[in-house]
């Protein structure tokens, strides 16, 4: 689980778009071969599924980050819509990040990483993406 924030958002939709983009960048950094992205925003999920940047369902402000998401996630292109109730954990985590301004927390509780450095934490320890701040990384 990764908690991060960005200051380039002006609406919940834009926040969701930038969250998808950041997830794609993390997936690339971790060199994931497969992946799925979850969103509770149905129009965004439909646009991502169609991979149509000119889809009028979504605000024009989303087109640049969505375009970048498409470029980065071409092999990880599965975006699923989930209900807002199902997405409660992500919603709560987002509010935790907004309410806390502490140093980043990196932790691993995987038993398979007990005797070796966690490869996920090692990969993300110095990972920086312009416009984003990582607040927590928990390898579960």
What residue ranges belong to the model's regions?
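Primary recognition of RNase H-like, Mg2+-dependent phosphodiesterase/nuclease domains
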Residues: 1-140
């Amino acid at each position: 689980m990764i908690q991060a924030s960005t200051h380039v958002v002006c609406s919940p939709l834009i926040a969701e778009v930038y969250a998808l983009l950041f997830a794609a960048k993390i997936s690339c950094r971790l060199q994931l071969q497969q992946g799925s992205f979850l969103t509770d925003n149905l129009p965004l999920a439909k646009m991502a599924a169609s991979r149509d940047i000119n889809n009028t369902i979504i605000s024009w402000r989303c087109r640049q980050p969505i375009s970048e998401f498409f470029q980065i996630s071409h092999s990880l292109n599965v975006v699923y819509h989930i209900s807002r109730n199902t997405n409660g954990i992500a919603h709560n985590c987002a509010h935790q990040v907004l309410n806390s301004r502490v140093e980043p927390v990196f932790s691993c509780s995987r038993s398979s990483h007990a005797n070796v450095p966690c490869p996920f934490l090692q990969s993300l320890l110095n990972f920086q993406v312009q416009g984003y701040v990582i607040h927590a990384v928990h390898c579960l």
